């Protein structure tokens, strides 16, 4: 039983994402009204400013599994500086992984930019820990940079579709936690 669990955990998915599986509103159980008004406003404003923006990660996973998310993260093609210009009540944080905290009312939403594979030359310390990770990329590249398939799900509020680049939708339905890519490499990047 333990071997099977470990096998499921370290099971590899392709490290190349191409066109996503698009799960329509008729196929998934996400009710758009369950997404925080703050995240909804941020995504809508970014879309109106000409940017792509999605709910991403744990919130999408939780909504698909019937849970109430503890927070909502947004990912976009806008750089942190562009996000900051769109939202006056925001602030860029982080050196290693720059993102933007956008405040609305008493809520806080983290807005990150799509990430691309990073260069290892001078971005890691001698122990292999990532020091800087601000290489921006596409939604496809961002998906394969995430830790688990169930955290690489994107919710498009315009179409109400879930975009799945790594098999995370099926993994949520099967209650499987699967690492994306090579487990040893991926786990070395996760800092708890």
Regions found by a protein language model. Give the residues of each.
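Catalytic cores of the polymerase beta-like nucleotidyltransferase superfamily
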Residues: 1-189
């Amino acid at each position: 039983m333990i071997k099977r669990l470990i096998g499921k955990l370290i099971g590899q998915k392709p490290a190349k994402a191409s066109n996503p599986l698009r799960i329509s509103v008729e196929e998934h159980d996400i009710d758009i009204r369950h997404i925080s008004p703050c995240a909804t406003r941020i995504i809508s404003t970014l879309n109106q400013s000409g940017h792509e923006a999605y709910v991403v990660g744990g919130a999408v996973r939780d909504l698909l599994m019937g849970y109430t998310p503890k927070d909502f993260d947004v990912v976009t093609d806008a750089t942190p500086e562009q996000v900051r210009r769109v939202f006056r009540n925001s602030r860029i944080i982080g050196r290693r992984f720059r993102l933007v905290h956008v405040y609305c009312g008493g809520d806080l939403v983290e807005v990150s930019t799509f990430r691309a594979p990073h260069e290892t030359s001078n971005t890691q310390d001698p122990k292999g820990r990532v020091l800087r990770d601000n290489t921006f990329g596409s939604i496809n590249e961002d998906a394969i940079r995430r830790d688990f398939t169930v955290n690489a799900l994107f919710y498009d509020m315009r179409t109400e579709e879930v975009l799945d680049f790594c098999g995370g939708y099926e993994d949520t339905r099967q209650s499987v936690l699967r690492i994306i890519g090579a487990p040893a490499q991926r786990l070395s990047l996760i800092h708890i």
